[in-house]
Amino acid sequence: MSIKKDYDVIVVGAGSMGMAAGYYLSKQGVKTLLVDSFHPPHTNGSHHGDTRIIRHAYGEGREYVPFALRAQELWYELEKETHHKIFTKTGVLVFGPKGEAPFVAETMEAAKEHSLDVDLLEGSEINKRWPGVTVPENYNAIFEKNSGVLFSENCIRAYRELAEANGAKVLTYTPVEDFEIAEDFVKIQTAYGSFTASKLIVSMGAWNSKLLSKLNIEIPLQPYRQVVGFFECDEKKYSNTHGYPAFMVEVPTGIYYGFPSFGGCGLKIGYHTYGQKIDPDTINREFGIYPEDEGNIRKFLETYMPGATGELKSGDVCMYTKTPDEHFVIDLHPQFSNVAIAAGFSGHGFKFSSVVGETLSQLAVTGKTEHDISIFSINRPALKQKETI
């Protein structure tokens, strides 16, 4: 194959974060090469399954709110630039038992601190407003009106098309075999030969856990197998067209998340947990191989959304890549300021991929970013742990 060998920036891993970075680099006229082991968007990483929730009031920590709001701005901008559908404002409903749901409580505090437009609801109000939901009286909720659903594969598809239109090159089905780094020079080795640049962005998803060591970086990253299911439901209660929102629910058995039915696809639901530890190269991608793949989420639906317990229409398997504290890693390499790292998004990263891409592009071009990414430092104490939970 014939492809130029020297670039300003090479992006290794052209999934959620990397493809966004490639777009923002190419938009500035930066000569960019994106290299991926597959053909993004694809079904081998953490971005497939059609949809992802974007929340602004953030139960994982109110420090994320400005990052989430900037991500939303960028998603709106992307939608203006492409013919692909990027975002639908469904609203996001977060609920759980009052006084026993710290995720819900932090979501409410984040909304209050940042003056977000939300409704606070009691159990009976939840049941009345959304007849598809059945919750006890002692539950409360926060409904965030301006949040909603991102169409994840479309997001990556749009970023790729726009980046390529700007002159970026995307090299697919090309695993990176090795890296060579100096202060103002990087080289990657692939089956198609070597490629060089002055800057490098590494965003390899679950494969960060295996390959960052080649860059002399040791971060405790653990990939996990994650599943979602699509269930037949009462479309008049659970469809987007009838006003059903995306949701996050914290109950005694854990945290669940889901989406309204779009175009009859069924209600989509997942159990936000860290299940089987896996190797991304050998993960079993067959939904239903474990009884709990369907069992856990069906049991939740039977209790809280009984009109969505029809036949399983389909199921998907993807991956979470967890850090010990479940916060991201977005930073420069400790020894080489010409290398930026994005890793460990711990099952809640996709919504931020627009702003992460912007941040990575800024780090690559100027060595700094306008965004506060101190919580994502590669040098934070939590990353000194040898084992993940």
UniProtKB/Swiss-Prot annotation:
The keyword Nucleus does not apply. GO terms for molecular function: flavin adenine dinucleotide binding; sarcosine oxidase activity. Its cofactor is FAD. It catalyses: sarcosine + O2 + H2O = formaldehyde + glycine + H2O2. Keywords: Cytoplasm, FAD, Flavoprotein, Oxidoreductase. It is found in: Cytoplasm. Changing A14 to L/W/Y: Weak activity. The modification S-8alpha-FAD cysteine is found at C318. GO terms for cellular component: cytoplasm. It comes from the Bacteria. Changing D36A: Loss of activity. NCBIfam families: PRK11259.1, soxA_mon. Decreases in function by replacement in the G-X-G-X-X-G motif are suppressed by chloride or bromide ion. Monomer. This is Monomeric sarcosine oxidase. It comes from Arthrobacter sp. (strain TE1826). The gene is soxA.
